[in-house]
Amino acid sequence: MRLLLALAAVVASPPDVQKLTLTPAQVGPNYVLVQRTDGHGVTNTVTLNVCGAASTYPSESRRLTRIQVDYLKQKSTLGLSNEVVTYRPGGAAQAMREVLQHVATCPKKAIVTDRSLPPLKYTLTRVTGPKLLKGYIALRIRVTGNVQGKKVDQTSYAIYQRKGDVLSGTYSFGPNTSAQLRFALHAAQESALNLRLGRAAGGGPTA
């Protein structure tokens, strides 16, 4: 009986999100992993706010475990963040559906997605790439508006993939160039490999 209980606990426990995050080597040469102050746990943290506040994503309440880390490189304008989240059964699939719904209904006017920021306009464009998990959602996100009197016009990429009840988001930031898109897609391909294997496929330094 004790053995059966132990086996049941192994089956029921969610995957270790830390083992599924990208390694710096997977992101690119000379990138280092940087911890975030909001990088661990689901309390007072946000996973989904694409064209809408987190409160408009009911799947946020179905998260179980979460990690998010950044990857930076000296003298590079391209950076990346990888977020891996486990959900209660069905939660990751629900999260992907909610993202698609927000993409389809994103207002053309400025909206508030974060209480720390003024209303901003979000222009979402679907992009495609090879070697990603079936059902992936890859977005080019252009944000325009004014923050503290300064004009803002930023382009980033967010790529969401799911395997079972695990969701991985890879988020790039940097200049609005084709290089950023290639960078984001490469990271997402590596994340897809991690999800398939159930572990990170490489190594590298942390900061």
Model-derived segments and spans:
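A small/polar (G/S/T-enriched), proline-flanked helix-loop surface module common
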Residues: 34-150, 206
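Stable alpha-helical elements in mature extracytoplasmic
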Residues: 23, 92-95, 99-102, 184-191
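Short N-terminal segments immediately surrounding and downstream of signal-peptide cleavage
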Residues: 13-29
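Short, low-complexity, Pro/Ser/Thr/Gly-rich segments in the mature regions of secreted, periplasmic
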Residues: 187-207
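A short, solvent-exposed beta-edge/loop patch
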Residues: 120-193
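Second-shell loop/turn segments in exported
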Residues: 13, 80-87, 173-179
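Secretory targeting and sorting signals
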Residues: 1-12
